[in-house]
Amino acid sequence: MIGVEHCDRCGFDRSQWNDRDAERTIAHAGAFLVEWSADAPPELMAKLDARRIDDLKAISTSPDLIDEVHHLWHGLVSIADVRRAAGDVVPRQHGTVTQLSASGGGVPKTAISSAAVGARGIEGDVQAARAHHGRPWQALSLWSQEVIDGFAAAGHPIAPGNAGENITISGIDWSTLHGGTIIDIGGVRVQLSAPAVPCQKNAQWFIDGEIALMDHDLHPGSSRWYASVLQPGTIATGDTVDVSPI
């Protein structure tokens, strides 16, 4: 894997990475591998645990920081492959894009009718805190319309785009998603990479600043999801969303 520029198997593209993004990503390698194994059936966990140990060993012995990222992504895709081969897949679901959102930096993001999406996300969308956002696996942020509606019904002053998600989706059971899930949105294919950690900037959308309500670890099925872009294209409000058990 040393020096590979692009990997068709895992989607790794060296040109999309710099040392800072790679270093911050590798710091959470173990958490990534655990997240992509989450909720796997007991009969698979021993196999996934052994694979995770091998992946972490390969990462730790790699001579190059960017190559470490490649090892990590290979490991993640391997986990997805093992789960898929065993029939441990997210159920096929169909939903709809209820809002696309972008901004020149910070929250809230504002609604747009359509967008071109590349490897780095929605063209023209800017992340205010680049140190914590904008890595290839954070190209897009997705959230559930039903989750937002539930918060709003409880009295929280939140609406689509407020929390910084780019794509708000209805009709998908958010509690069924996990790392590695592949979703087709309009003309774009994405892969879920990790749940987004709540940001203090979003405290304004919750009564008493209770951002823990959107924390994946505390409230599974309530968080935004980061996604990498597997196939660039365009998305428009009202487009079909397909969760693929592949």
Kindly label every feature range from the protein language model.
Residues W225-I246:
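Well-ordered alpha/beta subsegment
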Residues H156-N166, I207-S223:
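Short, basic/aromatic beta-hairpin or loop at an interaction surface
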Residues I2-R189, A194-K201, T234, S244-I246:
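Electropositive, beta-rich accessory/interaction domains or terminal extensions
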